Amino acid sequence: MDKCKHVGRLRLAQDHSILNPQKWHCVDCNTTESVWACLSCSHVACGRYIEEHALRHFQDSKHPLALEVNELYVFCYLCDDYVLNDNTTGDLKLLRSTLSAIKSQNYDCTTRSGRTLRSMVSADDSFISHEGAQAFLQNEDRAFTALWHRRHALLGKVFRSWFALTPKGKQRLEEERLREEAEHKREEARKRRQQLKHKLKEEMESTPPRKSSRLQQQIQPSPKIESSSVQKMNQKNAPSTKQNPPAPTSDKARLKKIGNSPIKRKPTVTPGVTGLRNLGNTCYMNSILQILSHLHVFRECFLQLDLNQTQELLAADGSGKTRLSSKYPPGAELPRVTQKHTKGQRSLARRPSFSLGLSGGASNSRNMELIQPKEPSSKHISLCHELHTLFQVMWSGKWALVSPFAMLHSVWRLIPAFHGYAQQDAQEFLCELLDKVQQELETTGTRYPALIPTSQRKLIRQVLNVVNNIFHGQLLSQVTCLVCDHKSNTIEPFWDLSLEFPERYHFSGKATASQRPCLLTEMLAKFTETEALEGKIYACDQCNKAQKQLMVCRLPQVLRLHLKRFRWSGRNHREKIGVHVRFDQMLNMEPYCCRESTAALRADCFIYDLSSVVMHHGKGFGSGHYTAFCYNPEGGFWVHCNDSKLHSCAVEEVCKAQAYILFYTQRVTQENGHLSERLPLHDSPQSPPP
């Protein structure tokens, strides 16, 4: 619509919530796909093709104008059309330019004369300058987790009261009463044995020693006080061991004791079930971080390794030359991460103590800073250090929500392509993140090795081995001459398999693409099918006709399958193939492997179990929302990770998801035939049952 009369009445507030990237998601369903911000109030919700929360807001409030956060379109509900005009003050134009600057984190502007005016605050510094906003969100994380604990405590109290009235609860109370009586009898028997032991010891000490013992005491006089006198003094001061039997415990107290038992009680928050706040179109990062944290071996590596201490050691001065403290000479082992330095040095205790924190009490600010600091303490930003810190919080079983400010800051600094609040691709982010982590480990391990303790160098090599090999596999590219049957083999490494959809899903224009579900096994078969080489691509002496085939010759421990859902449509447009891909919990890779290379493997080595799924919600490449399904081995259930909102789900719901990236974990490794023991650190990764 060229002219919308409702725009002229618009009065936009300068502190509108749309200027805060953390608000760029639906307040009801948490999606970042097709998000519309009301221009009359601070409400942000999804469009009518998602859950219609923005439309419902208009029906309740009668606020007509809304702006799409990512595409910057303005829509009028009263006119039922898009708005092209602006008000007299040009608020819409100013709002669009402001949002574009926030999204790209580029605050430069050009005057009419062509001069570029740069903001006094750089893009990186602008992230750090909003300490008030970060502190506010951290307090919200604290309050959210405290509320989580409070709700579960009340639910537990109500459940225990109800359980005490049921036949099963009464039986449980009777069993606990009998167990207490048996424990009391064992305690009494133990005390009687203790008294008898003390009595025999006193009698032995009161008897005169033998001659040989007296001579030995004269030769080597003992400066210690006689133990018998000390024991008699202690017995006089100590309370009598003969105590009355404890009063019988009431059923209510006994049931409460059962619920509060440290042996049986599980953490209120299951380790790993911690939400990540969306800081502004960061769902791509949150979904990948959830996936990596649920890969057991990957997580255990970074829980042990903290490169922050090593990098501070190497970067003690700007020239790269550093001297170790006299307390830690070269070759000595530095203190562990959980220890603290001497006075005047920064604390390295990364694991916060939650003694009074979020179990209904207030945690001090120092513990909050140890979770995700607002700014890395060292000039050398470390992705490994941020992974170490974030995984500690997510798997502590204490926090229900955390804001990954420091992780986002490190990504902005080290991976400039993801700088800003624009929507990004999760697959590209995963590849870039792993590449940067690998480079950081290689650089840290080889730079000034004499300054790094031997134990730390060994740990860095082990973690680097995990990062390099956990997704690493090998492909056999085999070209066969159709005339002389000569075969040319080439080994190529891979870290994921990008699978294309069959041709029936690639029609465009007048032809209609098929909407029948596609099978994952069909896409794998297409990846390994024989392909004819046309033209003078292949030269075999006098022959030229050949065919090529890709086969897997070395299986990775974690198999990443990237479904190529986005295709080019026209010159500059990429559209999405939205067909459902059927995949199972178990995947047999034997049909797609080279028989000659894998002939010595056991049959179980080809079996993979589904461990994680990344989903893309939306219709286009440049827009949409990412969520993830992760199998949590601590709780033995699947979790749907939608930024800050997490909930358990059934595996049937997982298999119905519109998958974008699939993660399968090898059930038995090919080196030794044991369950997932390829990598050297800690326990073997726990895979979901088939």
Swiss-Prot record:
Q: Does the keyword Nucleus apply?
A: yes
EC number(s) for this protein? Answer: 3.4.19.12
List residues of the USP domain. 274-667
A single GO molecular function term of this UniProt record: zinc ion binding
Q: Name one GO cellular component term.
A: cytoplasm
Instruction: Give its localization.
Output: Nucleus
Query: Is this entry keyworded Nucleus?
Result: yes
Region named Disordered: 173-272, 319-366
Q: Where is the composition biased (Basic and acidic residues)?
A: 173-190
Q: Which family does it belong to?
A: Belongs to the peptidase C19 family. USP44 subfamily.
- PANTHER family (alphabetical): UBIQUITIN CARBOXYL-TERMINAL HYDROLASE, UBIQUITIN CARBOXYL-TERMINAL HYDROLASE 44
Q: What is this protein called?
A: Ubiquitin carboxyl-terminal hydrolase 44-B
Please tell me the species this chain comes from.
Answer: Xenopus laevis (African clawed frog)
